[in-house]
Amino acid sequence: LSICRKALTRYMPELVPTWERLGHLAGGNVRVARMLSLYCPAPYVVGCSQAVWTGSEPLLVRNYDYHPDAFEGVAVHTQWNDTRVMGVSDCLWGLLDGMNEHGLVAALAFGGRRDGGVGFGIPLILRYVLETCHTVDEAAAVLDRVPSHMSYNVLLTDRTGDHAVVAVAPDRSTTVERRAFCTNHQDGTGWARYLEVTRSFERERRLESLMGDPAMTSAELIRSFLKDPLYSKEHARGFGTLYTTVYRPRAGRMSCLWPDRSVDQDFDDYEPQEIEVETPDSPTDSQAESRPSESA
């Protein structure tokens, strides 16, 4: 526990009081506190497509592709450190994607590389970014400073329309590119079997085509995320699309989308609610064998 505390204090000191409060709420259990630090966690692999619309009203749209049994299925609205944040939760207090009241938006995608190292789970780093930063440049600086335990692509935008893809990894330097979209690989390389199964390059080509179309509208871009190849139906293999989110930083509005429904929330009128979304059955043993594994 002392190692986790030291790492949090060094890299994300503003989160330490909240971490301590959460540990207290959990009864002071040491194992729970260590888990909540997300320091050097077990590897986890997701598939995502995400893009920033840079038109008159900037927005970020993304799909989250993962195993339904490992998904918390919780969207949250918090104000833990004087900043209101809303997004989709992971690891109890981390975020898969989210936006703060200053108009900064961040979303993660696995970077397609198996190499692991010493660092934090990316959901907690995203939480920290949205708790402490106002702009894309500030967020990129934090992502460069705080070590990630695996490779991820983080897409950022803010209410000015500035945007960037920040590629983090435990074994090489962080890169920042002024690109408006990303999927699940870095530098055109990575874990070959995973990239094949998740169609990362195909999804990237589709995003490049959409973003390069001068007639494209934001509404059409969003609809494209509910269609093949960006929308994945590979739930039986653990990489199906579980939700689509759209963040509009100027309006302070978040939308969660599925093919048959949507839920809209905003900072000033966030309404807790519970909905039921049907996803295909979990993978069978034989289907799970077709997924890329750590030994693949």
What are these regions (language model features)?
Residues 1-31, 37-39, 54-296:
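C-terminal, well-structured catalytic/ligand-binding subdomain of enzymes
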Residues 41-52:
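Charged, often glycine-rich, active-site loop that binds/positions anionic groups
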